[in-house]
Amino acid sequence: MVNGKSANSKSIIMNWIKTNWGWVTTIIIGFLPLIGVLKMINLDFSETAETWISMDSFTMPGRRPGELPKVVTGAGMAVKETGEWAIRWIVIILSMTPFSILTGKKPSLWVRQAAGITAFTYAGLHFLFFCVDKGWLETFKEMGFIIGLAAALIMMVLAITSNTRSMKFLRKTWKKIHRFAYLVGVLAILHVALLEHGDWMPYLIIMVIGFLIRSTFFKRSISGYRTRRQS
């Protein structure tokens, strides 16, 4: 009887994975870089509670010519890594519609949902490690930090409502809410640009190209091209 229940459970799980393979694949790919971040964390329960969790420090080369290397805390390195992956996944999400326009292949809602969950997870961890490294009050001392927090809060709303129940409950309002994903992209670029913590220009270029592809002129041009090819 137990073996029968176990086999039935495995069958249900396998069928779910087959049905939602796009969601599962996106989540796995998205969370793989977290392994590197988790490796920075050291657990030691032999001493007092204050030392149970610690993170190694790293020596980072200067970003500009002539700039001396500097020592970065493990939490600081985690802030950098999670922040970079957060903005990468934000750009990936915003690139899905342009990809659909160019190829005629529309990513499923579940792939978009998984990408959104991944982006929000990295953004949440980015803020968490920042609080560990600098303290949460530091968030309100610079405009770049405030803009980043605003982007993370909007992403939280999008992540919470990224399901079929919310779509049915909110109806037309759901699409309006999820258009704020574009604002998240803009805020994320501003966040990085104002703080000068990374190379934000490639992300800006990709986003601008994506917005141009979404334009009515470009959509009509693509549609006309496909019609001519089919005739």
Predicted features, each with a name:
Residues V2-S231:
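Membrane-embedded alpha-helical bundles that constitute the cytochrome b-like, heme-associated redox core
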